[in-house]
Each structure stands twice: as C-alpha cells, then as structure tokens.
C-alpha cells in the first residue's frame, strides 16, 4: 500500500476537503458490484467502533477554530457509547451552575443521512458550515478544535500570517502536534507515501501551515508533501488586499521550498465561463468548483494500479515546485486532447488568466483526463532517460497524461445547477492539469516588489531575497523563442 495522510487547516480548507472526502466515499463499491478503480486504502483506515464493529474512516486531521465545526462532533455514532445523562456530583456538595452554549441545530441534509432517507437538495442558503454537507464519519482523533481563536471574530481575527506562526509554536510546545495528531495515523501505515495539506495561504493559516510543514520535513524528510494553498478570491479594499498579498508572499517563500507540490488556488477565480453557474458568495459553491479540478488532477495518486505521480511532478530536473491548477469541463463526444501541451483552459485557479508580458514557457505539464476517450500520452517506445535528455537539450517541456474512464460524479452534496449546459446531471468529463510555467516568475516578481514596500524591516531582506531566488528558477533554463508558448 502507498498511504496518504491529509491535514486540513482552517475553514476554507475544510470546505474544499469536505467535497474531496465526499467524492472518495462515492467511489466505494459493495457486494457484487465491480471493483472500484480507486484504491480506498490510500486515504482510508480500518478501525473498530465503540460497539466492536469494523469501521473505515479517512486518514485525516481536521483543524478549525472555535465555532468552525458546525454540527460535527468529535464523537459520532461510530465511536460514541451511551453515557449517563445525570452523573454524580463527585466530591463537590455545593450548588452547580452549568452554562452551555446552545447547540447548533442539525441541517435537514444531515438528518436525512442519519435516517437513511433521500437527501433534500442543498442550496447556498441551507449550507451554513462545511459539516452541513459532509457525508462521512471521522475518527475522534481527526477532529482538533483550536480554542484560542473564534471563527469570524472581529475582536481577535485570525488573519495575520505571524499569528498563525505563533499559535503553532505555542500549541506544539505544549502538545507536540506532530506526535499527538499525525504519528498515530502514520504508525498505522504500511508504506506512507505522502502528506497532503489543504490550507489557507493568505491569512494566519499560512503561517500555521509553514511551521507545521517545517516540522513534517524534519520528521518525514523523504516523503512527498503536497500543498493545496487556498487564496480568497473575493474583492476587498486595497489595504486588506495588501495584507493578503503579503501573507501569500510569505507562504510561497516558506512553504514552496519545503513542498513537493505547492499549488496556489484562487477561490473563486474571477474568470468563470458562461457555461458554469457559480454563487460566488457561497463557499460551498466556490469550493465545489475547485474540488472538481483538484480531485481530478490528483486522481492518479489513488488509482489502481499504482502510478508514479511523484516522478511526473518532479519533471526533468526536480527544481520546480509551484504548480498552476487548471481545468476544462468537456461535453460527451468532444476531443479535449488535440495537442499535448495546453496553455489555455476554461478555468485557471492559480493565476486567473494572467498573461505574461512576453510569451510564457511551459516547463512541465501533468494532465488528467477522466470520462474521456484516451487521447494517449507521450510515446512509451523510447527510453525515458533518452527522452528526458532530448527535452532538456531542446528546452522542451515535460508532458505526462493520465487517463481514466471514471467520470466526475455529481453528488447530492454538490451544487446541482453548477453545470446547466452539460447533458448529464449525474456525471461530467473533466480535463485537469498541473502546469509549471514562467508565469510563476511574473507573479513572484509582484510579490517581491510588494514585500520590499510593505514587509517589516526585520523580515524584508530575507523575504525579498528568498522570493528572488525562487523566481530565478522559473526564468532560467529555457529559450524565449520556444515553440511551447501560447501562440
């Protein structure tokens, strides 16, 4: 087995990850059904419930602030034994005054799941928390509430990157988070393959993630670390945007050099095709759109047979870690793969349609097509080492395509009206990609300039120089007149 442990850091990360886990649960097959092409052991762990029954729960650790879990409890029906509702007073003989916060009422969707009834159609109005559309049970160890900060607090907002750093340091000093939260899951693995991290990157969760991943690298140095770094795409005032951009710059600087994959994700992107309906005010909607691309492009990591996803990410030189996430929804019968390297997609989650001042160069592209006719990939007839040297000599990009006939399922936990023009309402075909290109250098240059103007004196030089060093790897090693641009 090649297991993956997931970390979910913060509210936006949990909105996206909940869609991800609902999709994984939908791939299970039962009884006489044909075996699923998805290997569930990659992301799920066997266990035993409170009543002795066998369980199968996600191998994940979910962090959120106080009030962020909604109706999700640490102990659910799988792990909860009936407790005495009127416990004794113990040694205290005085009068007790018990103060409890009013419980959040369960959503109709969750009530229907518990009762085994058909689920009602969800809407932006009925989804209040990410737990409102969650379809899975989690192990109690997976639920970690951080009580130091409260969700959406105006008094102590969890927004500044350094606050996240400080919170991690305090908690890690007191509890050793890696030992308490990650190690129990890691020790259950036969062959731990990677750690997958969903995190916000333009708020305090970026600082929290940076410190966490630094610890992960110390402990699991040879394992892959895949980071889905979520940025708030909603319009805000100029001052707030400066703060967010500085947080992004800090996250790229601190995390991308430690990660095997660092994919900045704008949630939501501003450029939405007319064929897609999106309620940009709803995180349930926007994270659903992201999940269609993110879950599709990472699908090879859990398909049978084993795919060497890491080698495809590494490219020819292993120096590029910042990837662009892109996708296109494809109608039945469409040929989505006329040419191997694609530079234009319907949805660009990383640079939101940013065009370089000059034509941009693609260093590496990994495509995943699902539900489509297999257009084939790079020829396997020639030795891969020779192909790699040829590409390097000719400044050509590395290209890899994975294909599966498994379409993207439209679950009842997913917005039902997001793809109104597609023929099928139950499944869609998707072409998704992770791309390394010189557009990253353009964005890093913007961050360098911002850091030079806005960052504090104590971090300015380190941040500007560090971003400059990363930027150079996306500018060198290719010829500007390469054929692989967006002509």
Swiss-Prot record:
Keyword Mitochondrion: yes
Main subcellular localisation: mitochondrion
GO biological process: mitochondrion organization
Pfam families the UniProt entry points to: Misat_Tub_SegII, Tubulin_3
Keywords, in A-Z order: Mitochondrion
InterPro entries referenced in this protein's UniProt entry, alphabetically: DML1/Misato, DML1/Misato_tubulin, Misato_II_tubulin-like, Tubulin/FtsZ_GTPase_sf
Cellular component, GO annotation: mitochondrion
Subcellular location: Mitochondrion
This protein's record includes keyword Mitochondrion: yes
UniProt family annotation: Belongs to the misato family.
Function: Involved in the partitioning of the mitochondrial organelle and mitochondrial DNA (mtDNA) inheritance.
Protein name: Protein dml1
């Amino acid at each position: 087995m090649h297991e993956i442990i997931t970390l979910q850091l913060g509210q936006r990360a949990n909105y996206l990850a909940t869609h991800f886990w609902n999709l994984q649960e939908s791939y299970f097959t039962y009884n006489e059904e044909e075996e699923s092409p998805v290997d569930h052991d990659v992301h799920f762990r066997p266990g035993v419930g409170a009543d002795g029954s066998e369980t199968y729960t996600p191998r994940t650790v979910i962090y959120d602030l106080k009030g962020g879990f909604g109706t999700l409890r640490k102990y659910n029906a799988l792990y909860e034994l009936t407790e005495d509702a009127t416990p004794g007073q113990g040694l205290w003989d005085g009068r007790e005054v018990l103060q409890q916060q009013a419980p959040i009422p369960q959503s109709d969707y969750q009530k229907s799941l518990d009762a085994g009834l058909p689920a009602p159609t969800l809407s932006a109005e009925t989804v209040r928390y990410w737990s409102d559309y969650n379809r899975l049970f989690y192990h109690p160890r997976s639920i970690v509430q951080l009580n130091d900060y409260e969700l959406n607090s105006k008094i102590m907002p969890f927004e500044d990157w350094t606050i996240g750093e400080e919170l991690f340091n305090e908690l890690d000093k007191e509890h050793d988070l890696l030992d308490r939260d990650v190690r129990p899951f890691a020790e259950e693995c036969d062959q731990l393959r990677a750690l997958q991290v969903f995190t916000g990157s333009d708020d305090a969760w970026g600082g929290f993630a940076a410190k966490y991943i630094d610890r992960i690298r110390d402990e699991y140095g040879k394992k892959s670390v895949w980071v889905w770094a979520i940025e708030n795409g909603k319009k805000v005032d100029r001052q707030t945007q400066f703060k967010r951009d500085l947080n992004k710059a800090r996250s790229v600087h601190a995390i991308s050099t430690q990660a095997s994959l660092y994919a900045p994700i704008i949630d939501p992107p501003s450029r939405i095709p007319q064929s897609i309906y999106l309620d940009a005010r709803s995180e349930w909607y926007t994270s659903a759109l992201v999940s269609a691309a993110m879950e599709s492009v990472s699908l090879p990591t859990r398909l049978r047979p084993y795919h060497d996803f890491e080698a495809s990410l590494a490219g020819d030189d292993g120096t590029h870690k910042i990837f662009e996430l892109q996708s296109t929804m494809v109608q039945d019968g469409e040929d989505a793969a006329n040419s191997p390297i694609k530079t234009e997609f319907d949805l660009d989650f990383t640079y939101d349609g940013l065009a370089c001042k000059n034509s941009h160069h693609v260093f590496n592209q990994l495509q995943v097509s699902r539900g489509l006719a297999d257009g084939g990939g790079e020829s396997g007839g020639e030795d891969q080492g020779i192909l790699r040297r040829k590409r390097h000599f000719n400044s050509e990009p590395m290209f890899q395509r994975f294909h599966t006939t498994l379409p993207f399922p439209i679950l009842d936990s997913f917005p039902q009206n997001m793809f109104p023009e597609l023929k099928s309402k139950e499944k869609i075909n998707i072409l998704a990609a992770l791309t390394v290109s010189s557009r990253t250098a353009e964005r890093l240059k913007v961050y360098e300039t911002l850091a030079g103007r806005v960052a504090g004196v104590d971090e300015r030089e380190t941040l500007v120089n560090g971003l400059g060093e990363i930027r150079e790897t996306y500018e060198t090693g290719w010829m500007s007149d390469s054929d692989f641009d967006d002509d």
